[in-house]
Amino acid sequence: MKLASIDAFYDDPKLVWEWYEDRRKNILDVKPNEGHFAISQMEEFKDVVILTQNIDGLHQRSGSTNVLELHGSIIRIKCTVCDFADNITENFESLPPKCKCGGMLRPDVVWFGESLPQNIWQSAIKEASVCDVMVIVGTSLVVSPANTLPVYAKQNGAILIEVNPEKT
């Protein structure tokens, strides 16, 4: 986790990029599981919004269309200087990659020491506040501020369903 910080990126961007490139390639080899597909199939019958801390893009690859990625996506890049952002579609010739403006590109993920993107966070609060049912899957609910989203749902009278092998 030492490399998952803004400080590590500016200290050694090449090392951080090598680590993320390895993770990205591994993630691209992984297929969505039955749970991902079940959630995407629910969209055919109900209004489903996915609020996820995962950065792997598996929800979208399973067919889900309304996904709020609180911690960003390892499949996207953004510039450290300008507003450029895009999906990663090919391997980079050298690391760290450079933007057309000359700035360094970085993985579009939230690192330790950074805040969540405010537009995504505000959308997540809104969705949690108006949902009828919130299904919480595979999280310990210890990472703040995402762990407050069930509180917003419960304050609105939503039913909370937790699916987790460990007690939280």
Model-derived segments and their meaning:
Residues 1-168:
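Conserved catalytic core of sirtuin-type NAD+-dependent deacylases
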